[in-house]
Regions:
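Face-selective signature of the C-terminal outer-membrane beta-barrel domain
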Residues: 223, 227-245, 273-430, 448, ...
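Surface-exposed extracellular loop regions of Gram-negative outer-membrane beta-barrel proteins
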Residues: 422-424, 457, 461-507, 527-547, ...
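Short, acidic, small-residue-rich periplasmic hinge/interaction motif at the N-terminus
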Residues: 21-57, 77-79, 87-89, 125-127
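N-terminal periplasmic accessory domains that precede
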Residues: 64-67, 108-110, 123, 133-157, ...
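Outer membrane beta-barrel strand-and-loop segments of large Gram-negative receptors
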Residues: 338-342, 495-497, 501, 507, ...
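C-terminal beta-signal and adjacent terminal beta-strands/loops
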Residues: 647-699
Length: 699
């Protein structure tokens, strides 16, 4: 509590803006949305807020999860989970396209992905109609800077940090003739330590589980973009992406039971875990502009694959003797194939009428295979209860249309996305009390309209008022619908729910933005109404422990107020503040909960940026997030303060950067479950207190 009280005034005097010596006008875009805004060294404001990673001194040496925390109302936890305006399910895109590696394993990816690779992160609560309607509070998009012939043809990066951390990268930028070639590669290696503890009390008594684990992830990431100016009005681009994360992990799980007031060890379970996550993508884009530059046709086709392989070896040790009393293993193979096609056409008519129409198609095919063995009487035997074969298919076809009208300082847009969605699950699994495998085949289809409306008024040259309504959806990932119980990680046993329904969200926002060359002020009021809200729930399985699952937690609504302000009083100093406060309400009485729950939650964050000399820059930033509501309890507050300093050499061709993350080690996450029959306290933490030194050279 004392640490919290000390952090609040410290963070309150910080700012959200990222350092820039000279603020400049900047046109920002996310897919087909273009917003004119003022840029404070990396953070661009407006309907779409975009952060330039290499302008952020504490984030550029970190990961994408670290950088997300610098955006207004966006917070990430120690495992890469994202909270945006109180929602844990924002849409995640790469260059406006959904990817398989940004689904249920996105946390693993975000805490390993070097921040400098996708060096622009964007956020918007009112996405363009040309984007998929998935995501609760809005979307977060990863993209790269558009390199031109005026930029450096070669950029080299080399970094090292405490606890055996290393990073190296290169960017190649060439523009021969009509070609535009940009290739990037980054390698990152770390040695990570994690701690975990869980105390569970139910009718059977109290048990305590502790686990200290270490991991060595190796991450390779590369992409290549080749553009060609076919004509003065046509640009064709092909793009490829490859990502490999491979690591080994060891954990020793201590299982204890409270007997007569004394905590007695029951068993030590050793886990030797190897994981390999591999993703690749191939993409083609065609941009065509007509005689009127506002008339354009955009076509995008993307195929991306994500593979997940996990090998587990277990040994159970008797604490009293140190002897191994049981051995078993467990293997998981998962493969995802994603196809995406979008065709968007925009036409500007007389009197400032603008029409946009298009099609978006998404096709998913996933397979999941699990199996395991156990050592019995000195021989390895297959364990039928660990076997699972699961296939998931989804077909989503979406037609869209939007009409916009501008007159004077007013503008209005009305649009709709009409979607036909079909999906099928096909699984074979075995329960504890049935000897043969149980088949389950289930298919569903639906048609749904996603309407939207936006009204805007420009009050003067610097101010704009907007009122918007949009309907969005959260679709369960394929693995969330698999009824099989995954016991690969004893600290987090997981079971899918084949009866999960899509979560539907109605969002209304009233926002105002005021921007000059040195000051930006942006307050927003928002409201979200959710039907079939998807949230985590823990099940009490008695002597078998607890099992996590996903469930539709009835009706829910959120009222919130967001405020961000940035100010550059003098050339060498940039200040600001961002805060978000909201009332989160969960009404689960329709599914058996005894009462409606609510909590006032919020976060505050910011940074201060100083140009000490023309070649020396300093940044401090931090955030604090309050307790968060869950269906069965809460997640306790957490915070982080970071610092970064850069020194330029050789006429700014060489930069040395020192960053320190999570200075006060405040990211520890405590989850509390408090129900009539189950009380649980779970604490997770990892060594996020990291110091990095990075050298960047521009040819």
């Amino acid at each position: 509590m004392k640490r919290t009280l000390l952090l609040l005034p410290a963070i309150a005097c910080l700012s959200l803006s990222v350092f820039a010596q000279v603020p400049v006008d900047k046109t920002i875009s996310l897919q087909s949305v273009e917003i004119q805004g003022k840029r404070f060294g990396g953070l661009t404001g407006g309907e779409v807020k975009r952060l330039q990673v290499d302008s952020n001194l504490s984030g550029l040496t970190g990961t994408t999860a670290d950088v997300f925390r610098l955006l207004p109302s966006v917070v990430t936890d120690i495992e890469g989970g994202i909270t945006f305006r109180g929602s844990n399910n924002p849409g995640l895109l790469i260059n406006g396209v959904p990817y398989g590696l940004l689904e249920e394993y996105s946390g693993d990816m975000l805490i390993q992905l070097p921040a400098l690779f996708f060096d622009r992160v964007s956020m918007t609560s009112t996405p363009s109609i040309g984007l998929v309607p998935d995501g609760d509070a809005g979307i977060l998009n990863l993209s790269s800077v558009v390199y031109t012939a005026a930029d450096s043809p070669l950029v080299l990066t080399l970094g090292a940090g405490f606890q055996e951390r290393y990073n190296a990268g290169a960017i190649l930028n060439l523009h021969p003739g009509k070609f535009h070639i940009v290739g990037k590669y980054n390698y990152r290696r770390e040695f990570r330590k994690r701690t975990f503890s869980k105390s569970t009390t139910n009718k059977g008594g109290t048990t305590v589980m502790n686990n200290n684990a270490s991991a060595r992830p190796d991450v390779h990431l590369a992409d290549l973009s080749v553009g060609y100016d076919l004509t003065a009005n046509d640009l064709i681009t092909v793009y490829g992406l490859y990502n490999l994360m491979d690591y080994s992990r060891y954990g020793k799980i201590h299982n204890n039971k409270l007997v007569d007031g004394n905590l007695q060890p029951v068993m030590f379970r050793h886990r030797y875990n190897d994981q390999r996550q591999e993703a690749y993508a191939a993409e083609a884009r065609w941009y065509h502009t007509f005689d009127n530059p506002k008339d354009r046709l955009d076509v995008v086709f993307n195929y991306n694959n994500f593979g997940y392989d996990e090998d587990n070896e277990y040994k159970n040790e008797k604490p009293e003797t140190g002897k191994i009393i049981a051995e078993d293993n467990y293997y998981v193979n998962q493969d995802k194939n994603n196809y995406y096609l979008s065709v968007l056409y925009g036409k500007l008519f007389a009197d400032d009428w603008h029409l946009r129409v298009g099609y978006i198609g998404r096709f998913k095919d996933e397979s999941y295979h699990a199996y395991g063995n156990k050592l019995a009487a000195g021989e390895w035997q297959s364990d039928p209860q660990k076997e699972n074969e699961y296939n998931f298919n989804r077909r989503t076809n979406l037609l869209l249309a939007a009409l916009e009208k501008k007159w004077g300082g007013f503008c209005a847009e009305a649009g709709v996305q009409g979607e036909l969605n079909w999906q099928k699950i096909d699984t074979r699994y075995q329960t504890d009390d049935v000897l043969e495998k149980i088949p389950m085949v289930k298919s569903t289809s639906r048609f749904h309209l996603f309407p939207r409306l936006k009204l805007g008024y420009r009050t003067d040259k610097a101010g704009e008022l907007a009122l918007s309504y949009v309907q969005r959806v959260i679709r369960p990932y394929g693995s969330y619908l698999n009824v099989f119980t995954d016991r690969s990680d004893a600290t987090h046993v997981w079971k899918g729910n084949p009866d999960l329904k899509d979560e539907m969200i109605h969002s209304v926002e009233l926002s105002y933005s005021y921007a000059t060359s040195a000051f930006r002020f942006s307050p927003s009021l928002y409201y979200r109404n959710k039907k079939n809200r998807i949230m985590d729930k823990v099940l009490d399985e008695g002597e078998n422990g607890t099992i996590w699952t996903k469930e539709n937690i009835g009706h829910s609504q959120t009222f919130g107020f967001e405020l961000s302000a940035t100010w550059q009083p003098i050339r060498m100093l940039s200040l600001g503040l961002s805060g978000d406060i909201y009332r989160d309400e969960i009404d689960g009485r329709t599914i058996g909960y005894d009462r409606k729950k609510s909590m006032v939650c919020g976060d505050i964050k910011g940074s201060v940026n100083i140009c000490i000399t023309p070649t020396t820059e300093l940044q401090l930033d931090g955030f604090y997030i309050s307790d968060q509501l869950t269906p069965q309890g809460k997640i306790k507050h957490r915070s982080s303060v970071n610092a970064g300093i850069s020194q330029y050499f050789m006429h700014r061709k060489l930069r040395a950067n020192l960053s320190i993350n999570n200075i006060f080690n405040g990211l520890e996450e405590t989850t509390i479950v408090d129900t009539k029959d189950l009380q649980m306290t779970q604490v997770r933490n990892r060594d996020a207190q990291v110091t990095w030194v990075t050298l960047t050279y521009n040819l």
